[in-house]
Amino acid sequence: LGELADAAAALDWLQRQNPNTNQCWVSGFSFGALMCMQLLMRRPEITRFISISPQPNLYDFNFLAPCPASGIMLHGKKDELVPVEETQRLAQKLQSQKNITVEYEEISGANHFYDNEVHKLNKILCSYIEKELNSRFR
């Protein structure tokens, strides 16, 4: 996939710009969530992921067995493109794996694009990132 090669090239560039970092997070929205998770499987230096509105109804996520890093998945309860149950199932599958923690949040009132609900998405993401960063530096 050209998109995956682009994501890998972007990650390479970021790592060259930040050679002394001890963390590497990836994030993606919708189709980008698929790219983020595929990159996660190919790059062992990735320590966390954020997957926003993945599309397990359109794409096969079975390659995430086992998933090598902890992270969070978010989904709008009023998503008109991806049934909430599909993402719930994917999250449950990942949550059952050992040695990782996968959080799952549904955002009330949010559609696939979080129209008029971006503030809720931002609040959850900021809280998760702060919690994870603080736990790594205790």
Which role does the model predict for each range below?
Residues L1-Q17:
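Alpha/beta-hydrolase active-site loop
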Residues N18-F29:
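Alpha/beta-hydrolase fold nucleophile elbow
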Residues G28-C36:
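Gly/Ala-rich beta-loop-alpha elbow adjacent to hydrolase catalytic centers
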Residues S51-Y59:
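Active-site nucleophile loop of the alpha/beta-hydrolase fold
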Residues C67, I72-H75, D79:
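Short beta-strand/loop motif that positions the catalytic acidic residue
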Residues A69, P83-K93:
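Short alpha-helix in the alpha/beta-hydrolase fold that links the catalytic acid
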Residues K78-V82, H112:
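Acidic catalytic loop of the alpha/beta-hydrolase fold
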Residues A91, S96-R138:
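C-terminal catalytic histidine-bearing segment of alpha/beta-hydrolase fold enzymes
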